[in-house]
């Protein structure tokens, strides 16, 4: 264990301007506060785990200080303890800290034995990651040999999370050619090691030097670059943080720009330190002159859920059927969404507040009915939001502190006094979820959600979009086991004319089925309702509430797996259908869809990105059909197909995260986001977690000229997909965002084509270069670009920095295809020298019809390798009769094999022989 001394790690936070983040982290005088480490409810109780987390973080603060030139340190952290663990005197109730906004999740390994620390990164270079994942065994120090000290590995992950930097190693392609010479992928290039391969046969193993492949110019499969235990290089933390000497990130001076790794691929060849230096945190801090204190810790234990509904019943709620819709959505929340064991109260407000019901615990259906009957029946008066909030605080404090409680605030009106209670809200420790109903809801409403970490949603007056019910359906608990949460399977609406039918199907898959509820609403008269289960049996027993204009059916036990069919008939009116359920089994993770946007405010012409993360437990669901419905305050709805293709807005292919740019703004104000996901004949579940941004697995190290091998890294097959069909249906609220600076129609074209991020190149036929990429659009990843500009150079930096001066390829015959189509282009390099050992670099720029240009693409690379001539062996006397070998020579370039290198972002080498 020579290279692994007791070390510490860096915790540095990159707060993106305008970015949507649930994180509670704040930077205060060089110290980071409010970081949440959550222990998963399924982790067995182990009090030593808490101390191990503390030790890791305490070590980290010093390393943070050193690595950033005394600029940052780790000030405090909250450790979130499961409700199922024993209570202790020093465990207190959380305030705003929840599992949903945790920065670090400590959970059992998936699959078992895979303890690799990793970070979810959905965005591009410089964009904040989602969450760090660690296992109890990793934190306990049981993986020191494989990943080095826990603190150092955690720094590596935190840089992914807060700064949006990427790995500087490459598990798929560990070596590359540079000017005809083999180089190990590393940063900095001064790190030393030996290229060896471990061979095992018959229970015994031995080590030998890697064999040079005279055809490809690279080493054989299985070759490892094993590091010397003693190094002098100080960088880089994103390559090999476990090495004692490494205490820095790569800078522009020592960064290895040619290495085919994700950092170069995603960040346009920039060093990690350059990316970090561009962060807002770095720009607003200066180095410290004194030693900071050790970090402090708070131990927070999840308790019973406490919720108070604060509902607007002012005069404006009488218009547009709003009060009735509030009752429908409120009943869904009370009858289905809120979990058993929760404490729920209700306050209404107009010009003043009115307590409808004190806190009661939901232990039975009768408790739910009691609250549902207290929903407001009449609307009148003005709007005083602060009165409602203050009354809710009073209701909660009669039984519990407000810390960690939740308030669901719905309003449709303006209130210019809302800022008067902001300080009280901050001091309360309560989480406020806001629902803005209609076009005139108070503009300051979202501030309440932002300052408390609550959800912000918007529902228009377009009843058929079912926005209000979706908003309340999204308010399941942010804590506790996922098996207890309400999951929305369907949400649909339609305006019928002349006794038309609203027909459709809902899939109940094997991961859900408990507490399944069918909810139907109407605007005029009760419709005819027909429902059949998968066996064709007609279902009856709907509870009809003519006053609220809704009917619902709770399926007893576990609903049958399969396709449920419904038919609704009515005269001219609007109907909606909502179906919710829960996990069928506490030990079988349900398929979930989590949707969001990359920011909650968007200033035109800045594009917005919509994400949908589809998982069963930790396993991603691939090849689903995913669409986002984005509705503006004008009532206009845009439908986006979200893709998991690794192009455009989508950062990584086949990781279960579906993404797309939104550019179709039509007005200023609020927009709601809703995602529909369907799994059919093509959908599949990946057995293992896809390769994420994670710390380097150490194959071994060299100590006193001897190689000490670690056990082989757990195999993670990127193609390990279960081909059994995954049929399911889900809907998910993606919250809302607010757009500004949108010009009046006609809206000008200010959006360029999207950046090409998956350009690959290979030599074809000895003299031609074949390019492939995913087509961008006229506006990012929508429409069709007008033309492409392709340039080449023998210098990677010249092509990046002097693209317009580099040699241009004739693309007259290249007509762009529609966005997200595969493009193929074959050309012959001209007016450039291409000889043995030469690397040729290629990049593309897309141009739209108004001459707006995309960013330069990733840089692809082809390398020409001519194997050395091998003299014929002199035959031994007893081999004189041996026949001569039959030699085949490439007909295009005699005596030369061509090495074709397809390099995605100079990152993912794929080698083949022409």
From Swiss-Prot:
<dbReference type="InterPro" id="IPR004727">
    <property type="entry name" value="CLCA_chordata"/>
</dbReference>
<dbReference type="InterPro" id="IPR013642">
    <property type="entry name" value="CLCA_N"/>
</dbReference>
<dbReference type="GO" id="GO:0042589">
    <property type="term" value="C:zymogen granule membrane"/>
</dbReference>
<feature type="active site">
    <location>
        <position position="157"/>
    </location>
</feature>
<feature type="glycosylation site" description="N-linked (GlcNAc...) asparagine">
    <location>
        <position position="890"/>
    </location>
</feature>
<comment type="function">
    <text>May be involved in mediating calcium-activated chloride conductance. May play critical roles in goblet cell metaplasia, mucus hypersecretion, cystic fibrosis and AHR. May be involved in the regulation of mucus production and/or secretion by goblet cells. Involved in the regulation of tissue inflammation in the innate immune response. May play a role as a tumor suppressor. Induces MUC5AC.</text>
</comment>
<dbReference type="GO" id="GO:0005576">
    <property type="term" value="C:extracellular region"/>
</dbReference>
<dbReference type="InterPro" id="IPR036465">
    <property type="entry name" value="vWFA_dom_sf"/>
</dbReference>
<keyword id="KW-0732">Signal</keyword>
<dbReference type="GO" id="GO:0034220">
    <property type="term" value="P:monoatomic ion transmembrane transport"/>
</dbReference>
<dbReference type="Pfam" id="PF13519">
    <property type="entry name" value="VWA_2"/>
</dbReference>
<protein>
    <recommendedName>
        <fullName>Calcium-activated chloride channel regulator 1</fullName>
        <ecNumber>3.4.-.-</ecNumber>
    </recommendedName>
</protein>
<feature type="glycosylation site" description="N-linked (GlcNAc...) asparagine">
    <location>
        <position position="503"/>
    </location>
</feature>
<dbReference type="GO" id="GO:0046872">
    <property type="term" value="F:metal ion binding"/>
</dbReference>
<dbReference type="GO" id="GO:0006816">
    <property type="term" value="P:calcium ion transport"/>
</dbReference>
<feature type="domain" description="VWFA">
    <location>
        <begin position="306"/>
        <end position="475"/>
    </location>
</feature>
<feature type="glycosylation site" description="N-linked (GlcNAc...) asparagine">
    <location>
        <position position="831"/>
    </location>
</feature>
<keyword id="KW-0645">Protease</keyword>
<keyword id="KW-0472">Membrane</keyword>
<feature type="glycosylation site" description="N-linked (GlcNAc...) asparagine">
    <location>
        <position position="810"/>
    </location>
</feature>
<feature type="site" description="Cleavage; by autolysis">
    <location>
        <begin position="694"/>
        <end position="695"/>
    </location>
</feature>
<keyword id="KW-0479">Metal-binding</keyword>
<keyword id="KW-0109">Calcium transport</keyword>
<dbReference type="Pfam" id="PF08434">
    <property type="entry name" value="CLCA"/>
</dbReference>
<feature type="binding site">
    <location>
        <position position="156"/>
    </location>
    <ligand>
        <name>Zn(2+)</name>
    </ligand>
</feature>
<keyword id="KW-0406">Ion transport</keyword>
<dbReference type="GO" id="GO:0071456">
    <property type="term" value="P:cellular response to hypoxia"/>
</dbReference>
<dbReference type="GO" id="GO:0005886">
    <property type="term" value="C:plasma membrane"/>
</dbReference>
<dbReference type="GO" id="GO:0005229">
    <property type="term" value="F:intracellularly calcium-gated chloride channel activity"/>
</dbReference>
<keyword id="KW-0862">Zinc</keyword>
<feature type="glycosylation site" description="N-linked (GlcNAc...) asparagine">
    <location>
        <position position="804"/>
    </location>
</feature>
<feature type="binding site">
    <location>
        <position position="160"/>
    </location>
    <ligand>
        <name>Zn(2+)</name>
    </ligand>
</feature>
<keyword id="KW-0325">Glycoprotein</keyword>
<dbReference type="GO" id="GO:0004222">
    <property type="term" value="F:metalloendopeptidase activity"/>
</dbReference>
<feature type="glycosylation site" description="N-linked (GlcNAc...) asparagine">
    <location>
        <position position="836"/>
    </location>
</feature>
<keyword id="KW-0813">Transport</keyword>
<dbReference type="GO" id="GO:0006508">
    <property type="term" value="P:proteolysis"/>
</dbReference>
<dbReference type="InterPro" id="IPR002035">
    <property type="entry name" value="VWF_A"/>
</dbReference>
<feature type="signal peptide">
    <location>
        <begin position="1"/>
        <end position="21"/>
    </location>
</feature>
<keyword id="KW-0868">Chloride</keyword>
<dbReference type="GO" id="GO:0005254">
    <property type="term" value="F:chloride channel activity"/>
</dbReference>
<keyword id="KW-0378">Hydrolase</keyword>
């Amino acid at each position: 264990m020579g290279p692994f001394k007791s070390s510490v790690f860096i915790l540095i936070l990159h707060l993106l301007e305008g970015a949507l983040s649930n994180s509670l982290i704040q930077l205060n005088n060089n110290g980071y506060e409010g970081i949440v480490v959550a222990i998963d409810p399924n982790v067995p109780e182990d009090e030593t785990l808490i101390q191990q987390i503390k030790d890791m973080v305490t070590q980290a603060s010093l390393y943070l200080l050193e690595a950033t030139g005394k600029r940052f340190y780790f000030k405090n952290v909250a450790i979130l303890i499961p409700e199922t663990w024993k209570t202790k005197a020093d465990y207190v109730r959380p305030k705003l800290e929840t599992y949903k906004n945790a920065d670090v999740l400590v959970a059992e390994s998936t699959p078992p034995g895979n303890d690799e620390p990793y970070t979810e990164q959905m965005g591009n270079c410089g964009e904040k990651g989602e969450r760090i994942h660690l296992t109890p065994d990793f934190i306990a120090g049981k993986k020191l040999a494989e990943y080095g000290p826990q603190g150092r590995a955690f720094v590596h992950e935190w840089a992914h999370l807060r700064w949006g930097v990427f790995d500087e190693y490459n598990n798929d392609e560990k070596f590359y050619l540079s000017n005809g010479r083999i180089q190990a992928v590393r940063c900095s290039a001064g790190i030393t090691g030996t290229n060896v391969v471990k061979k095992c046969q018959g229970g015994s193993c031995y080590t030998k030097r890697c064999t040079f492949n005279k055809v490809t110019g690279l080493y054989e499969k299985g070759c490892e670059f094993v590091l010397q235990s003693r190094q002098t290089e100080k960088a880089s933390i994103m390559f090999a943080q476990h090495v004692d000497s490494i205490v820095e990130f790569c800078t522009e001076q020592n960064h290895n720009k040619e290495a085919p790794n994700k950092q170069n691929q995603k960040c346009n060849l920039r060093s990690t330190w350059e990316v970090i230096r561009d962060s807002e945190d770095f720009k607003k801090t200066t180095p410290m002159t004194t030693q900071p204190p050790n970090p402090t810790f708070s131990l927070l234990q999840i308790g019973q859920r406490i919720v108070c509904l604060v509902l607007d019943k002012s005069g404006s709620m009488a218009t547009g059927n709003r009060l009735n819709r509030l009752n429908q959505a409120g009943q869904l929340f009370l009858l289905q969404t809120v979990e058993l064991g929760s404490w729920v109260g209700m306050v209404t407000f107009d010009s003043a507040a009115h307590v409808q019901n004190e806190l009661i615990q939901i232990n039975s259906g009768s408790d739910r009915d009691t609250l549902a009957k207290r929903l407001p029946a009449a609307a009148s008066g003005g709007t005083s939001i602060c009165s409602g909030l203050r009354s809710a605080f009073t209701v909660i404090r009669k039984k519990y502190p407000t810390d960690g409680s939740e308030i669901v605030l719905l309003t449709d009106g303006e209130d210019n006094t809302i800022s008067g209670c902001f300080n009280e809200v901050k001091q309360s420790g309560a989480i406020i979820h806001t629902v803005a109903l209609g076009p005139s809801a108070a503009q300051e409403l979202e501030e309440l959600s932002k300052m408390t970490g609550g959800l912000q949603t918007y529902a228009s007056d377009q009843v058929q979009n079912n926005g209000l019910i979706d908003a309340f359906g999204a308010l399941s608990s942010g804590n506790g086991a996922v098996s207890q949460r309400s999951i929305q399977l369907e949400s649909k609406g339609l305006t019928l004319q002349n006794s038309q039918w609203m027909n459709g199907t809902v899939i109940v898959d094997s991961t859900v089925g408990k507490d399944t509820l069918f909810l139907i609403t109407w605007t005029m008269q009760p419709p005819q309702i027909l429902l059949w289960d998968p066996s064709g049996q007609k279902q009856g027993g709907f509870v009809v509430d003519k006053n609220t204009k809704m009917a619902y059916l709770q399926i007893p036990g576990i609903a049958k797996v399969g396709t449920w069919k419904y038919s609704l008939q009515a005269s001219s009116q609007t109907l909606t259908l909502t179906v919710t359920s829960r996990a069928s089994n506490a030990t079988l993770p349900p398929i979930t869809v989590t949707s969001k946007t990359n920011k909650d405010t968007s200033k035109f012409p800045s594009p917005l990105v919509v994400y949908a993360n589809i998982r069963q437990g930790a396993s991603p669901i691939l090849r689903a059909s995913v669409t986002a419905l984005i509705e503006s305050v004008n009532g206009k709805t845009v439908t986006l197909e979200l893709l998991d293709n690794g192009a455009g807005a989508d950062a990584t292919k086949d990781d279960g995260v579906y993404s797309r740019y939104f550019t179709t703004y039509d007005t200023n104000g609020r927009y709601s986001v809703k995602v529909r996901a369907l799994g059919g004949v093509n959908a599949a579940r990946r057995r293992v977690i896809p390769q994420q941004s994670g710390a380097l697995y150490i194959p071994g190290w060299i100590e006193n000229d001897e190689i000490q091998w670690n056990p082989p890294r757990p195999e993670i097959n990127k193609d390990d997909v279960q081909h059994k069909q995954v049929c399911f249906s889900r809907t998910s609220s993606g919250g809302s965002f607010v757009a500004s600076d949108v010009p009046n129609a006609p809206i000008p074209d200010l959006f360029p084509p999207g950046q090409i991020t998956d350009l690959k190149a290979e030599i074809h036929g000895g003299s031609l270069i074949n390019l492939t990429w995913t087509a961008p659009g006229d506006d990012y990843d929508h429409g069709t670009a007008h033309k492409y500009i392709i340039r080449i150079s023998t210098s990677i930096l010249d092509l990046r920095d002097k693209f317009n001066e580099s040699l241009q390829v004739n693309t007259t015959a290249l007509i762009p295809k529609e966005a997200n189509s595969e493009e193929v282009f074959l050309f012959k390099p001209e007016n450039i020298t291409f000889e043995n050992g030469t690397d040729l670099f290629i990049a593309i720029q897309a141009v739209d019809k108004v001459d707006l240009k995309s960013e330069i693409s990733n840089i692809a690379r082809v390398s020409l390798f001519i194997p050395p001539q091998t003299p014929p062996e002199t035959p031994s006397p007893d081999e004189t009769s041996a026949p001569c070998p039959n030699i085949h020579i490439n007909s295009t370039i005699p005596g030369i094999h061509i090495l074709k290198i397809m390099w995605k972002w100079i990152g993912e080498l794929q080698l083949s022989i022409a």
